Amino acid sequence: MRTKYISMIFLASLMLICLSCKDEDDSLARSGLIECIQKAETSISESVEGNEEGCIAPGSKDILQTRIDWAYFILQNSSSDEAYTNALKILDDAIAAFYANTVKAGVPLFGLGSKMNLGPVGDWNVTESFSIVCRVKYNEFAGGDQNVISCESGNSGWMLRSSGNVIQFYINDGNWTGCQTSSLELNRWYHVAATYQKGGGIALYLDGKKVGSSSCGTLQVTPNADLQAGTAPSYSDRYMRGYIQDLSLWKDVRTAEEVAADINCDFSGTEDGLNAYWPLNLNLGTSITDKTGNHTVNLVDVVWEDPEE
């Protein structure tokens, strides 16, 4: 009987030791998560967001703060060692991603699912006149249409696109009216400009030289249709397979002389007639404000690659 009593005491003591060890493990896991939260909060307070190289990309602090808030939720609502450990891993990864999102030189690669959404085309006042200027480089030519920028919606809108190995500019004036370049090469940068003037026609330029023009009627647009770069808003298979940089939209028609001078794409954001300009030469994440400071776009599934050496 005495032996049985001693065994029961030993078993109870062992259970207390095990529980004590578990409490200690929980405490260590919880302390680790608290330290990680403090590290994340310090990262936010001591960093600077901005559009200059070396800054943290705009929007990064909000993303990290969301992870911090979630970690606090775990602290306040869980007593599980496993939950603390998982939260620590996720927050630690978020801190690493935060610092990896430093603004640096980059080139946006567009592909299936990629887009740069400029919002409703009705906000851009393009029915009287406009110009589009950009640089493009293709890593693949597709048999169908590849939209550089488009607000095509049924039988309305306009599009700067490639079809096969030529670039085309089309508007809908009741019918589709357009012009195109000669054949392009893969893996080479081209400067492209397209203009529209109500009653004055359309024109297309390649590397500063006019390569096509056509008379046209009045442009028809659906005001609430999205203006998107890298794809067509209404057709997911009409996506760009390559790179876009130095995208600018103008309220007026750029003259042949201006287009030739635009090749360097060195716009300050204060030029007369300039609606918006995105250099797209720095990895600024998924939300980018243009040089005028008036327009912010959202990028989806765009891959930022290192610039060419």
Briefly describe each language-model feature range.
Residues 2-8, 13-47, 95-107:
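Bacterial Sec-dependent N-terminal signal peptides
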Residues 103-168, 201, 253-258, 272:
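Extracellular glycan-recognition modules
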Residues 99-112, 122, 263-309:
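Extracytoplasmic low-complexity segments
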Residues 130-140, 238-264, 275-285:
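Extracellular, beta-strand-rich glycan-interacting domains
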Residues 214-243, 269-275:
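Flexible glycan-contacting loops in extracellular carbohydrate-active proteins
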Residues 169-191, 234:
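Short, aromatic/His-centered strand-loop micro-motif at the edge of beta-sheets
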Residues 40-98:
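Amphipathic, non-membrane alpha-helical rod segments
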Residues 187-196, 204, 248:
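Short tryptophan-centered beta-strand motifs in secreted/extracellular beta-sheet-rich domains
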